[in-house]
Amino acid sequence: MSFYRSWIGEEGELIKRYTSSIKDDVEIAEEVIKVMEAHVKHLAEVGIMPKEAADAILKTLKEATPEQLLSSEFEDIHEALEKWLIDRLGEETAGWVGLGRSRNDHVAAAIRLAALRKASALRKNVEKMRCILAKKALEYADCAMPSFTHFQPAQAITFGHYLLAVDELAAEFLHVLKAVEKLLKRSPLGAGPAGGTRTPIDRERLAKLAGFEDVVENALYASGSRFFALALASAVVSFLTELSRTVDDLIRWNSPLVGYVAAPDSHVSTSSIMPHKRNLVTLEVFRARAAEALGHLTALNAVVMKIGLGYSLDLQEATRHLWAVLNMATEGVEIFIDFLEKMSFNCVKAREDAERYHSTSSDTAETIALSGVPFRKAYFQLAKEIKEGTARLMSIEEALQRPTRGSANPEEVKKAASTRLVFCREKPL
């Protein structure tokens, strides 16, 4: 029988399995212990908990491991931890830990801290990804290729320019992630179930003890809101959505029908019946899991939106979707990094396609217009010549000498990639 509901009576194995979060709580086990340590320290600091009891509890908490606490007989890890302490120290000592706390504010704190830990791991992976993108961009700064719009060959660029586009996505994601991390660093501790606690807790001090930087002001919002989870999951899924577009490009370009990307052997599999096949399975799984992450974000939003402002067990069910998004993203970026490091790009084939499919037509038309011919007149004349097969287009080298900032000009690519690599060397990962 669960601990807290023992005065109500046995709920039965079916209901216990159905409502318990104990299996999912492995994600927050370390943070739950950390939050409890901060709580006990603070109660002792303000003279509410006897020092002897606090010392005994803190010493015992050092021995606590997730494996000891994740027992299926409990509703959740918070109940399991309190019962574990009481079993070891007795109610006269460990019975103090329930004062001034609710599972509502403590689980919100543990989720925030665990989310911070996972967000930090993801951030480090994305920072590493940016450094590899910059290194590859410098390597392929002069590697001409067609860009693609509407899945049709478009303006001539370089593969280095393409990689810097992915880098800019990563940079924008890290900017958003930093803002979300500030939300995560606000403590809900001391908020109680909804309206605070009569125990004279210094919420700012308790926040610092638990590893937070600030306090969520309103107690109801602190314990009952999951905006921080929605914001984090939304940012991560938006990043995965955009990155999956690059993954889709790489999968297509790996096809021998295109022949731009040579995938490392470790990332491909083969067919059970067609021995010639080299299927880029890692990126296929990435693409699928990016879509799955979007499903988890939708589920997270759907669960949260249907309950009033205050804790309900629905929020317990919502949290697993946050972990799924973060875990998929972290693992997916690791796969993407490994692929980037080991792949190669066929510059000869890509250049041939850029020339074959008129990828310098816009630059040719612009150059004619800049000599004094109205652009639309130059455009239609060039279109006619392309149709007739008589067009004399600019060379790839000439076309790429665009003077605008952020263009595919190889010198622009080299400058941007080199600047990025300096930062990578100054802050090695």
UniProtKB/Swiss-Prot annotation:
| Gene3D superfamilies assigned | Fumarase/aspartase (C-terminal domain), Fumarase/aspartase (Central domain), Fumarase/aspartase (N-terminal domain)
> What pathway does this protein act in?
Amino-acid biosynthesis; L-arginine biosynthesis; L-arginine from L-ornithine and carbamoyl phosphate: step 3/3
Name one molecular function that GO assigns to this entry: argininosuccinate lyase activity
Q: Which GO terms describe its cellular component?
A: cytosol
Catalyzed reactions? 2-(N(omega)-L-arginino)succinate = fumarate + L-arginine
Asked whether the UniProt record includes Cytoplasm among its keywords, one would answer: yes
Q: Which SUPFAM superfamilies match?
A: L-aspartase-like (SSF48557)
Instruction: List, alphabetically, the InterPro entries matched.
Output: Argininosuccinate_lyase (IPR009049), Fumarase/histidase_N (IPR024083), Fumarate_lyase_fam (IPR000362), Fumarate_lyase_N (IPR022761), L-Aspartase-like (IPR008948)
Q: Does Amino-acid biosynthesis show up as a keyword for this record?
A: yes
One Pfam family linked to the record = Lyase_1
Where is this protein found? Cytoplasm
Q: Which family does the record claim for this protein?
A: Belongs to the lyase 1 family. Argininosuccinate lyase subfamily.
Designated name of the protein: Argininosuccinate lyase
Identify the species of origin: Pyrobaculum islandicum (strain DSM 4184 / JCM 9189 / GEO3)
